[in-house]
Every structure is written in C-alpha cells, then in structure tokens.
A protein has these predicted regions:
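Flavin-dependent oxidoreductase catalytic core characteristic
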Residues: 1-207
Length: 207
C-alpha cells in the first residue's frame, strides 16, 4: 500500500492541514462578517468590518492557490493513475484552474491588499490584526507552546516584511508591486496557522 511510504503520508497530512486550517479561517471570517453586520456596539462592528476588508483578498487568493497546489499534490499521490480520467482528479484540477483567475486574478487581489488594505487608516488595521495574532499566541496552555513559539517566530518575520513593504509603497512602488504576491502568501500562511492555534486552544482545553 502506498500509505506505507512516509512521503505519501506527509503529502496527505500537508493537504489535510491546509484544507482544515483554511476551513477554520473561513468560519472565523464568516463570524466577523456577522459581527460587522449585527453587533449592537458600533465600535466592535467597525473593527470586524475592517478585519473582513483586510482578509477578503487573502482568503480568495490563498484558498484558490492552495486548491490548485493540493489538487496537483493529490494527482501526484495517485501517480499516473491520477492523470487519467478514471479517478476524477484531473477533472478537479481542470475545474480548479479557473479559480485563481476569476473574481479578480490573484495578482490583482495581492495588489489590492498591499496598495489599499495595508495603508487603510494609516496601517492601523494590519497592525491590530498582527497584534491580535500575537496576543493569541500568549496562551498559558503548555500544550500549545511548541505551536505558538513557531508562530511567534514567523509572525516577527511577517511584521518586518510589513514594515518593509509599507516603506516601499512610499518610495518604490515597483518594488512593492513585485512583492505583493509574496506578502499576501506570507500573511495567508500566518492566518491559517493562527486559525489552527484557535482550534488547538479549544482542543487542548480541560473542561
């Protein structure tokens, strides 16, 4: 059985971790959408609306890009059999190929994130989001520590990247434009990791 190969197990776990992490992120963003529409406190409504605005291009791009990568990896797991029509993987791959293109290509989504969302309210929205992620990493649950330590290390890299790209927006738009896709992907992976931290926080809780 191919499941006996460590590389196959790694591929399956990679697909599972991305899919379930994105699902958790989607649920969180849906919750923020509800809050932005119906919460009685106007300040909380606005904060949720800001988060939805910031994360919309991230979710659209990461979900469609990762959908492509995961479907391709699934085909690889099937081997040559996955390339044929028998298993349906090739159909999923072809169907998914349009998703990074329509509703604004993913490069357009990345440019929207960098040139509009990052500078909105003088960068206060992205700063608050990164601070929220950092605060959620400060859990007292020791079981979470290996995961939160890893996330905090990468969050520091993203914070430096954010400062760099904000500076480039002011002084070198070509450099900022060239880095748009990389920045969105970095923020996307941090967001998925943060969603997993929220899931693990509940899973590891002693009830």
């Amino acid at each position: 059985f191919i499941i006996e190969h460590a590389d196959i197990r790694k591929s399956l776990l990679n697909m599972k971790s991305i899919i379930e992490g994105e699902r958790a992120l989607c649920f969180w963003l849906s919750q923020q959408t509800e809050v932005s529409l119906y919460h009685p406190d106007e300040k909380i409504k606005q904060e949720a609306s800001d988060l939805v605005s910031l994360m919309t291009p991230v979710v659209k791009t990461m979900f469609s890009d990762m959908g492509m990568e995961i479907t391709s990896e699934a085909m690889q797991v099937h081997g040559g059999y996955g390339y044929t029509k028998d298993q349906g993987i090739e159909q999923l791959y072809r169907d998914n190929r349009i998703t990074p293109i329509y509703e604004g290509t993913n490069s357009v989504q990345a440019a929207d994130l960098v040139f509009r969302k990052l500078v909105n309210k003088n960068g206060d929205i992205i700063n608050k989001y990164l601070e929220m992620v950092k605060n959620d990493c400060d859990s007292e649950n020791e079981k979470l520590k290996p995961f939160t330590d890893e996330l905090k290390m990468n969050l520091e890299i993203l914070s430096n990247f954010t400062s760099w790209i904000k500076e480039k927006i002011q002084n070198s738009k070509d450099d900022a434009s060239a880095a748009c896709n990389d920045y969105l992907k970095a923020l996307g992976f941090i967001s998925i990791a943060h969603a997993w931290i929220k899931v693990l926080e509940v899973s590891f809780k002693d009830y």
